[in-house]
């Protein structure tokens, strides 16, 4: 028993096993083998290394976005002239990555709390029995008092009076001048894995350049100042259409960087996408077209609280940062090479199947490839 254990350990540590190889001179099998190996080699070089960059590690960025609108708008509604600046038409005003630029509005001035009739169509009535006191209607403006107003044939409500009438949207939009507003975007990204920080104000963009440039896909692709009309156009929308009822546009800042080269070549690319807003062009959600919201400015007059209500139609802009940085790394490189070497074994498996099961001389090849032993014969010899 001791000698058997010793022999087993000796065989394990001091012997090397290698598979038996048979050289088959067959043109068909040889061509199939080389074609498969060539295909695997093309896959490793073309797909894994060139297209998928299998020799590099990757990282996504931590980013921040700051935005600033500039421009002045002018309206003249029923003889009332007004100038609109940034504080009036941008919501919210903090310079976030998502904001709304007002392009059209419906204004209801001098509202105060009281009893007044609903709009026709909101809750029609023929008698007080049709107006249940203390109840609400989802599309109404307030709480019903239980009275039917004979002059309008609608229920009386406790609400901010006079109630808003938003059935007629101004056309053309009141703030068509918004087409000339400009948007300044400041974006900073950091790739933690590679300890690289970049800004869209890349080399060559200084105060003098910013004061004169305007983004153009061909002539000034790195300028961080955009004309609102150009943004709408590049997103595939018509400005007058989207300005009337509002809509949404996505500005994508794409940081795709190969850090094997100098970091100064890591620069942003801007893409513009129309999300919704033009019913005749892209928007399929016909039940709720455009983008709008309401806000009120409250004030006191003769010790009575009043408000001016604005239904705002605007262009919502969402600035989205997408990023991917790559850099050479020995670990994924060795992993990709090892996987490729393993895939080469497919050629051997396929060729063995052809040799052993498809060719006319398959029995001959089986005898050459496999060595058969007879256990009973070995037992007799040992005895």
Summary of predicted features, one role per range:
Residues 12, 242-245, 306-307:
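Beta-strand elements of modular eukaryotic interaction domains
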Residues 31, 239-241, 301-304:
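Eukaryotic intrinsically disordered and solvent-exposed regulatory patches
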């Amino acid at each position: 028993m001791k000698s058997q254990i010793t022999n087993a350990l000796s065989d394990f540590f001091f012997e090397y096993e290698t598979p038996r190889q048979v050289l088959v001179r067959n043109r068909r099998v040889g061509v199939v083998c080389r074609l498969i190996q060539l295909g695997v080699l093309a896959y490793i070089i073309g797909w894994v290394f060139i297209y998928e960059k299998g020799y590099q590690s990757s990282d996504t960025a931590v980013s921040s976005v700051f935005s600033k609108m500039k421009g002045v708008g002018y309206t003249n509604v029923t003889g009332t002239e007004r100038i609109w600046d940034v504080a009036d038409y941008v919501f919210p005003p903090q310079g976030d990555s998502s904001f709304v630029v007002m392009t059209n509005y419906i204004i209801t001035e001098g509202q105060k709390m009281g009893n007044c009739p609903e709009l026709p169509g909101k809750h029609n009535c023929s008698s007080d029995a049709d107006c249940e006191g203390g109840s609400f209607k989802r599309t109404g403006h307030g709480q019903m008092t239980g009275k039917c107003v004979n002059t309008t044939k609608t229920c009386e409500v406790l609400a901010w009076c006079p109630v808003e009438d938003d059935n007629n949207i101004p056309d053309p939009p009141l703030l068509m001048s918004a087409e000339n507003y400009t948007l300044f975007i400041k974006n900073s990204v950091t790739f933690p894995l590679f300890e690289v920080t970049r800004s869209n104000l890349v080399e060559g963009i200084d105060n003098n350049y910013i004061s004169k440039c305007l983004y153009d896909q061909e002539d000034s692709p790195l300028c961080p100042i955009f004309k609102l009309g150009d943004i709408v156009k590049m997103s595939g929308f018509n400005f007058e259409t989207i300005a009337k009822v509002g809509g949404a546009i996505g500005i994508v800042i794409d940081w795709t960087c190969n850090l094997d080269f100098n970091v100064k070549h890591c620069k942003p690319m801007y893409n513009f996408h129309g999300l919704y807003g033009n019913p005749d062009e892209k928007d399929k959600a016909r039940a709720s077209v455009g983008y709008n919201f309401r806000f009120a400015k409250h004030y006191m007059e003769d010790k009575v609280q009043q408000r001016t209500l604005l239904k705002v139609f605007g262009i919502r802009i969402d600035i989205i940062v997408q990023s991917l940085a790559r850099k050479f790394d020995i670990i994924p490189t060795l992993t990709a090479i090892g996987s490729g070497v393993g895939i080469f074994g497919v050629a051997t498996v396929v060729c063995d199947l052809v040799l052993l099961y498809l060719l006319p001389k398959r029995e001959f090849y089986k005898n050459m490839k496999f060595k058969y032993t007879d256990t009973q014969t070995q037992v007799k010899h040992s005895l």
